[in-house]
Amino acid sequence: MSQPVENLDEVLKNHKLSKEEYEDILRILDGRHPNIVEIGIFSAMWSEHCSYKSSKKYLNGFPTKAPWVIQGPGENAGVIDIGDGMAAVFKMESHNHPSFIEPFQGAATGVGGILRDIFTMGARPVANLNALRFGRVRGDSDINKYQRHLVRGVVDGIGSYGNCMGVPTIGGEVSFDESYNGNILVNAFSLGLVKSDEIFLGVASGIGNPVMYVGSKTGRDGLGGAVMSSDSFTEESKSLRPTVQVGDPFTEKLLLEACLELFKTDAIIGIQDMGAAGLTSSAFEMAGKTGAGLIMHLDKVPAREEGMTPYDFMLSESQERMLICAKKGREQEIIDIFEKWELDVAVIGEVTDTERMELFWYGDKVCDMPIAPVSEEAPILDRPVARPAYLNEVIAKTVDDYAKVDDQEAYEKLLAPLEVVDKAWVYNQYDSMVQTNTTKHPGSLDASCIRIKENGRALAMSSDCNPRYCYIDPKGGAALAVVESGRNVAMSGARPLSITDCLNYGNPENPEVMWQFAQGCEGIKEACLELNTPVVSGNVSLYNETNGVSVFPTPAIAMVGLNDDQNKVLPSVFQHEGNNIVLIGETKGEFGGSLYIKELFGETVGTLPSFDYKTELKLWELVIEANKIGLLESAKDVNVGGIAIALSKMAAVSSKGITVKASVSNSRDIFDESQSRALLEVADADLEELLDMAAGLGLKAEVIGKIGGEEVKVNDVALPLEKVKDVYFNTFKRTIEQDL
């Protein structure tokens, strides 16, 4: 065995291990002091990024079961039954820290990592989404300019990787707030399709079965990445570029095809991608799930650089790599497949019955430790929590505390925020139509949809989160993220089934941040129980903080739903002039956390808009059932900016004017953000039946106007349609490209 390390205190500090954790390590190793390889392994496996040691106690309460759930949390991705022997495999993950340091590679490898999570399960990826948060991009300050640079780099990275892989990026969300000036958020979602009896898991079992390495060679890129992502940033953080992985989408495409060919054989027991902590996490997770032991010979791992050490091989986060537990005697068959695809492949070890990880370097043992305490029994922290001091002041304010703004002036200002306007500059850099399963172009649906060629159905998916809501009410805001993502799916005509989440929060060592996180988890749990949409996969990203300033709580939710008829995917833009516009739901004059207060007065304050799960479910039922029988021509949820902004979006994208007169108590209520509302387009012949259906469900329904004309007129505010279109379609590009 290698010798124990010198300068122990400095080594522990560099590896983000506490003295208490070192005492645990000594206990696990029966009093033996670990060498540098073993310290590196403990550091990675017990990092926040890999162990979830601050968050696990709160995640355990999530609902994860339903008749349609095949695989819940704990595997590479979640799996749900979508009928006729088919399953959808999906997950959302973060690549926040790497993307802030190196936006192109950080975002690109985030896409690569989530794609591997999907095809590792045996599924072919068929759709990507992303949820992106940036700081303030408007203005001439260095921060504004750098944020614009980050936007350009992240979008380029996502597009470059996804396009090369031949996987369509069909939707997502982009928002901006100064709370992200020091930490942007890059959350990637991917979904794949697989036959429900052909799913592969990340396990290693069977004494004597070989352990095989496939994919790219191992280099030093990404060393310490998991530990870096488990710490907050300072002004010097850009020096961490060496911890950011470098992606090669062409190699990943070869790896995808090779793996899918491999899955057609019965030559393997399990397979795991090498993500955070690289070979370390893959090996420990595969063996930890089954109670097996492993022997691995690190000198047999394909190397990209000379002079690499066992420490480098175990902790490198080089991309496009997999670890396989094969059936003994089938090695050559596997080697032939990967060599055909011009990928590296090597037998590097075998499964044992020792329940220990034994690593060798040219015959010398460099690691010997029990697997379970490292992979399954990482220390769980019970961090202190405290309700944030800012909340009392924030929720005490109402819209009435501000000077009245002329409604026309407000309308023109609320049309132009980057979170409102069209994101064609973003999604036109993504290939959204490759594989020819995308039902409609991005921007024309509240949820992105793909057809399932095997059974005539369609899958709808939507990512959502309003960080302003989560700032003023961490529990309610998180619950509303689930509600709103489900509402978007329902607006497309699909029934929401399950979620994956990406929980982005600040420094867990701050009791106020930990309280926000705990409350957010409670909100997600409550909403998923009430809406019957279990959590099947997810990710936690903490330490999104720079110089003591944390991001807004941002629990991004991606909802997946099923439409039984791919020919009945409901658009969110107007279809025919002369049709009626029907508003479903109550407008209550609620402005807490609203775009109205943020854009006009620069603050995020107020009480969260009220919502009721039963009413929300009735709204979903109305839209889904009315769409089935052909009563609806389009549907859009009412959210940020109220009915005025929702109607303006529908008008701009469809290039059709509108004349609307909605019943409101106060003229500014056309901008309020009351929940459980939708705008439905209904032909004259179907209007009475639609109104009867709404009444039968106890939902308020009001015919508020007609489609047609050259103006967008909502109550007392109006603009020429061409002006609305110019603002909507050109603002984003003008802002982001102003430095070029």
UniProtKB/Swiss-Prot annotation:
Annotated ATP binding sites? 52, 91, 501, 538
Q: Which cysteines are joined by disulfide bonds?
A: none
Q: Which Pfam families match?
A: AIRS, AIRS_C, FGAR-AT_linker
Q: Which reaction does it catalyse?
A: N(2)-formyl-N(1)-(5-phospho-beta-D-ribosyl)glycinamide + L-glutamine + ATP + H2O = 2-formamido-N(1)-(5-O-phospho-beta-D-ribosyl)acetamidine + L-glutamate + ADP + phosphate + H(+)
Q: Which Gene3D superfamilies match?
A: PurM-like C-terminal domain (3.90.650.10), PurM-like, N-terminal domain (3.30.1330.10)
Its annotated pathway? Purine metabolism; IMP biosynthesis via de novo pathway; 5-amino-1-(5-phospho-D-ribosyl)imidazole from N(2)-formyl-N(1)-(5-phospho-D-ribosyl)glycinamide: step 1/2
Report the protein name in the record.
Answer: Phosphoribosylformylglycinamidine synthase subunit PurL
